Amino acid sequence: MANPHARGELERVDWQVAGIGRIPCKVAEGLWPGQFSVTIEFEFKGQRERLRTLAHDSDVYLYGERPSGDRLVDGEIRVRVLGKLDGGVLVRLPQETLNSGPNIVVPKSLVRGEIRELIPSG
């Protein structure tokens, strides 16, 4: 995995360019080898959110040891920064969450990495 502390990269997403960022999360073992169960918790506009998703281990940066059994560990999940929306940042997770789609709006302060304005690729 690339250096998780490096500045954001650029990636072409459909017709626009978006930054790559990371969001803090709690990480547990997944059902399969190379898979993690990820929980993202945050507060946005007075609403407490708790989202769960599965992610390939290449999309998750662990701060320390790997999770095992029931033990959760701190980490960050890689996201595509799609733009600013509704006072927050619209990001795309590597997989859909268990309670919504892959795109979620989070507070800007939650996203680590560069957040750039979207630029038409034409």
Q: What feature does the model see in each segment?
A:
Residues 2-4:
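Intrinsic N-terminal pre-sequences and regulatory tails
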Residues 10-110:
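Basic/aromatic-rich interaction segments and small domains that mediate binding to polyanionic partners
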Residues 112-122:
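Short, charged, intrinsically disordered terminal tails
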